Regions:
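Expand to "…catalyze enediolate/carbanion chemistry for C-C bond making/breaking, isomerization
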Residues: 1-189
Length: 189
């Protein structure tokens, strides 16, 4: 995380950084990792305030602990929150309400921008409704989990050289892009 901040310092504010609490936290050290994220977000190293955080899966007990630690600890300097492993727009709306409630409790008046990872067929089926949510600013395609969710129907090569050429992958990316353009959001992968 420090290397990314250093690179951003050298290159300027030309890219965002996402601190990963889901895959970045060592097992058993999830709270310590979230605390480190807060420390870095509030440090002078966060020059441009273009650092967001990817929290744990909403079904994980660490989702709530991430929110409970990071929003009060560094919410004013947080560029966005990325929510992974969602299944539908109603779930995303409920998670946003939970985030907003914690922000209000923490004295944060701004609405934190939300990035949503589209990683499953369920979320892809509801991608237009997810994109329509006002606080959602970006939909990001989670290629690895999406391919894994097909249990071999998409070959493992779709995670390497051919990652964007398989028809199911192209279809998913197209749906995400169309939903984003329809509602003025940013598509990413």
């Amino acid at each position: 995380m420090r290397k990314a901040l250093q690179l951003q310092k050298e290159l300027g504010p030309c890219f965002d950084i996402t601190f990963d609490c889901e895959d970045g936290a060592p097992v058993g050290q999830e709270l310590a990792h979230a605390q480190l994220v807060c420390e870095l977000l509030t440090s002078p190293e966060n020059l441009y305030q273009q650092v967001g955080v990817r929290v744990h899966d909403p079904l994980s007990p660490f989702f709530d602990s991430d929110i409970d630690c990071i929003i009060p600890g560094a919410g004013q300097r947080l560029a966005y929150i990325t929510i992974p492993k969602v299944s539908h727009a109603i779930q995303v709306s409920q998670l946003i309400q939970k985030i907003n409630h914690k922000a209000t409790q923490s004295g944060i008046s701004k609405r934190l921008p939300i990035h949503v990872l589209i990683e499953t067929n369920e979320s892809l089926a509801d991608v237009f409704a997810i994109a329509a949510l006002p606080q959602v600013v970006c939909l990001s395609f989670g290629l690895m989990d999406f391919v894994s969710g097909y249990y071999g129907a998409i070959p493992s090569s779709a995670m390497h050289v051919d990652q964007f050429s398989h028809p199911l992958t192209r279809r998913a990316m197209t749906e995400i892009a169309v939903a984003c353009h329809t509602f003025g959001k940013t598509p990413a992968h």
